């Protein structure tokens, strides 16, 4: 039964994890907008999500989870996926070699934030639906 619950929520969980990682990448781009020679990076979200869904996240050794009681269910190790970072090609190169376009970064940051909130809303709806089914018996 836990496998079915995990399968139902896994897609949204992976999407949220990738969106959070993308937000960190976009934040780093914005923070380094004035750094000479900094190369703006991003990920192809759809291909990364497909990659994560195909391979799963249970491979390798990630953070270890400890049991504090004998009746606890042991969890598998979790490891963040290896992201394929892409370097952004600037529309208009700068003299110092920095490829950060602040308009593009702010737009991508806001778009990613909105999609993150949408994913949270969808996940919350799925959990509420499961809770109502479990409570009704």
From Swiss-Prot:
Predominant place of localization: other
One of the protein's GO biological processes: bacterial-type flagellum-dependent cell motility
Key words, A-Z: Bacterial flagellum
UniProt-listed InterPro entries: Flag_bb_rod_N (IPR001444), Flagellar_basal_body_rod_CS (IPR019776), FlgB (IPR006300)
Subcellular location: Bacterial flagellum basal body
GO cellular component: bacterial-type flagellum basal body, rod
Pfam families the UniProt entry points to: Flg_bb_rod
Function: Structural component of flagellum, the bacterial motility apparatus. Part of the rod structure of flagellar basal body.
Subunit note: The basal body constitutes a major portion of the flagellar organelle and consists of a number of rings mounted on a central rod. In Gram-negative bacteria, at least four rings, L, P, S and M are present, whereas Gram-positive bacteria lack the L and P rings. The rod consists of about 26 subunits of FlgG in the distal portion, and FlgB, FlgC and FlgF build up the proximal portion of the rod with about 6 subunits each.
Family stated for the protein in its record: Belongs to the flagella basal body rod proteins family.
Alphabetical list of PANTHER family matching this protein: FLAGELLAR BASAL BODY ROD PROTEIN FLGB, FLAGELLAR PROTEIN
Protein name: Flagellar basal body rod protein FlgB
Gene from which the chain derives: flgB
């Amino acid at each position: 039964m836990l496998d079915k619950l995990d399968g139902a929520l896994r897609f949204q969980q992976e999407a949220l994890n990738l969106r959070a990682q993308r937000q960190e990448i976009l934040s780093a781009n914005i923070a380094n907008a004035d750094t000479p020679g900094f190369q703006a990076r991003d990920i192809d979200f759809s291909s990364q999500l497909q990659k994560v869904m195909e391979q799963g996240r249970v491979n390798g050794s990630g953070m270890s989870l400890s049991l504090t009681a004998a009746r606890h269910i042991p969890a598998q190790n979790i490891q963040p996926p290896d992201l394929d970072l892409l370097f952004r090609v600037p529309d208009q190169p700068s003299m110092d070699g920095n490829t950060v376009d602040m308009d593009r970064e702010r737009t991508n940051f806001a778009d990613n934030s909105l999609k993150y909130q949408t994913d949270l809303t969808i996940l919350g709806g799925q959990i509420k639906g499961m809770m109502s089914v479990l409570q009704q018996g």
